[in-house]
Curated annotation (Swiss-Prot):
Required for interaction with prenylated RAB3A and VAMP2: region residues: 30-54, 175-185
Lineage start: Eukaryota, Metazoa, Chordata, Craniata, Vertebrata
Identification of the protein by name: Prenylated Rab acceptor protein 1
Region annotation (Homodimerization) ranges: 175-185
Cytoplasmic topological intervals: 1-78, 113-131, 166-185
Topology relative to the membrane: Multi-pass membrane protein
Amino acid sequence: MAAQKDQQKDAEAEGLSATTLLPKLIPSGAGREWLERRRATIRPWGSFVDQRRFSRPRNLGELCQRLVRNVEYYQSNYVFVFLGLILYCVVTSPMLLVALAVFFGACYILYLRTLQSKFVLFGREVSPAHQYALAGGVSFPFFWLAGAGSAVFWVLGATLVVIGSHAAFHQIEAVDGEELQMEPV
């Protein structure tokens, strides 16, 4: 018991533990497990952003090799870069924040209503999937006014540029016990 507490203190001394970083609102299940696996396999941010490790690839073969290897090696880091870009996009767009608030507010109201009694519309019981579709339909005009479509494409484009640039220009690290194979041209 004491050894387990010492290990937990050591992990917290290194940084925030995965359980404190994950929001309590994410329910237990596949999504939470996936996010915990991503958090557990994240590479050190120091080596991820080390400026001395960036250089121009010598040829197209090296570029392709870097892209494949870095995307595989830094996959979890890239997921968090993507999530950071989404957060940046939402925070810097007040109308998108309003649209998200309307959508999640409608979902929350429907959730509270189903706790009290079943939702009946025109004499028929409405399933939870249809209720959330109704919430999406109600909030759709707000998303349209907020320019959510352009925000989605901005996030995708920015992600491709940032991750693609990093993967192309970051030098490949030799993994323990594995050396790079050079083929003659």
